[in-house]
């Protein structure tokens, strides 16, 4: 399996502290291994960031960061379940992207490239 790097830039529009923006990035079915969030220098600390994989088979939220414009690395995972559907303590796998990655910003200022995100996916 190969690892691919993608750079995603999201701009926001609207009023200061309540501007929003979103971008859908077409990806193959893959595992999201890491995401580096780098915010515009003027992005406020009220910024909310959500990564999700919309659509089929189901919409899945992969990462939610609230009230933060701090540059950071994230490694989204999902907890494994056993055959009865119970969570397995300490057992996690990379988050699965179902063909599209939706990046959404809220609570931001109106900024071009409010977020520059670098992701690494295993295809």
Enumerate the language-model features and the residues they cover.
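Surface-exposed, low-hydrophobicity beta-strand/loop segments enriched in small/polar/acidic residues
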Residues: 1-123
């Amino acid at each position: 399996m190969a690892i691919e790097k993608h750079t995603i830039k999201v701009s926001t529009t609207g009023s200061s502290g309540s501007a929003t923006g979103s971008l859908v990035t077409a990806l193959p079915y893959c595992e999201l291994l890491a995401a580096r969030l780098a915010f515009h220098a003027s992005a406020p600390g009220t910024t909310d960031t959500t990564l999700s994989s919309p659509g089929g088979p189901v919409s899945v939220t992969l990462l939610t960061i609230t009230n933060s414009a701090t540059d950071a690395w994230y490694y989204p995972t999902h907890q494994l379940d056993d055959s009865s559907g119970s969570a397995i303590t300490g057992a996690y796998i990379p988050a699965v992207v179902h063909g599209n990655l939706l990046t959404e910003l809220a609570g931001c200022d109106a900024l071009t490239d409010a977020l520059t995100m670098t992701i690494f996916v295993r295809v």
